[in-house]
Swiss-Prot record:
Role according to the record: Cell wall formation.
Gene Ontology biological process terms, A to Z: cell division; cell wall organization; peptidoglycan biosynthetic process; regulation of cell shape
Lineage, broadest ranks: Bacteria, Pseudomonadati, Pseudomonadota, Gammaproteobacteria, Pasteurellales
Protein residues bound to ATP: 125-131
Transport recorded as keyword: no
Molecular function GO terms recorded: ATP binding; UDP-N-acetylmuramate-L-alanine ligase activity
Species of origin: Haemophilus influenzae (strain PittGG)
UniProt keyword terms in alphabetical order: ATP-binding, Cell cycle, Cell division, Cell shape, Cell wall biogenesis/degradation, Cytoplasm, Ligase, Nucleotide-binding, Peptidoglycan synthesis
Annotated gene: murC
Subcellular location: Cytoplasm
Protein name: UDP-N-acetylmuramate--L-alanine ligase
Amino acid sequence: MKHSHEEIRKIIPEMRRVQQIHFIGIGGAGMSGIAEILLNEGYQISGSDIADGVVTQRLAQAGAKIYIGHAAEHIKGASVVVVSSAIKDDNPELVASKQKRIPVIQRAQMLAEIMRFRHGIAVAGTHGKTTTTAMISMIYTQAKLDPTFVNGGLVKSAGKNAHLGASRYLIAEADESDASFLHLQPMVSVVTNMEPDHMDTYEGDFEKMKATYVKFLHNLPFYGLAVMCADDPVLMELVPKVGRQVITYGFSEQADYRIEDYEQTGFQGHYTVFCPNNERINVLLNVPGKHNALNATAALAVAKEEGIANEAILEALADFQGAGRRFDQLGEFIRPNGKVRLVDDYGHHPTEVDVTIKAAREGWGDKRIVMIFQPHRYSRTRDLFDDFVQVLSLVDALIMLDVYAAGEAPIVGADSKSLCRSIRNLGKVDPILVSDTSQLGDVLDQIIQDGDLILAQGAGSVSKISRGLAESWKN
């Protein structure tokens, strides 16, 4: 059943005594989406960020009061303050909020409030969250269910990462990086996979991380549904502890929604899903890689379990253009040594880099892959150092940028120079360290060959750098 936006108030009560909501770090992907939803629900929104950008400009045009830089006076009039996990304790707006006894909450607590009166579908996991959330959102939109969605990245076909729908459905990416997904109380929870990442949150203890995921799944009501990947041995080990209905998906023979006959032609994937009722569904995807077949099958399983027709599911998946910065093709360019294709990808964990390389190899045949890699966080580089050395040795040519610190202090032996040294010692590829990114175009022109696929890889500023490169190459 759909409702007009005026009727939303009848099913989603107003937050009492809350007129103005202030966001510290409003430009972040997760923060901006929640701000946009609340703005469209009729709340006054203000927010600050260290830099202006497309996201902050869009929010300002929609009616939010945006400040660039942080100052105590920015919180004037706020009924509640929302902080992102990147905000430090000495932030002047955070300090002023506490002094004035204004409630300060995490981003996930506000997302939980938005979800409280809705039918929530939360997507968690180390990899694939953003794409899976986007796919489910598009299926529900295609089925004319007008869902609200809040994603950690751009939903390309919607042109934004958040949307206020006029129905009870809310589809959201659940963030395990700071364990804040424990605030959410969804009806359906998807877990795509689980690997050691953000281990500082879990005190370096993978068992603690597993226990936190089980706790997240226990937030489901007894009549809720957990959708979990059967290909992930860690998740399958947790299934007996979940205590809720569990549906599985994957390439595994044990999966309830089983993928068979996967083939990739160019950057297109097609395969068959065998469903629990012996139904067979043929799926076409316009995003490459087996990892995307898994993401799509998670979305298909949720939709089937919730009674959505096959036609809407298959149309949405065939039309799916990807999530922002997920194997984002920036174009083909003529360079002095020949024609190259440039792709931007957000993957910043060794497993994500590995599946991106595999998808590129499948679609690009025997052509060379040239990677521009920017490590993200010193702590991740330290914790997964050997895995990075192995996976970055799989490309044909490697340009390494300096570590994107994301606010962290440098860690000895976890910098780009150390990575390059270890990769060189392995002997499969000879990396080139480029600390001055203004030199990147010149360095590339010296090493690229006709037909190369250039992969700009990482979660930091490498996307902006690669897009700047694409712009300069167009001229």
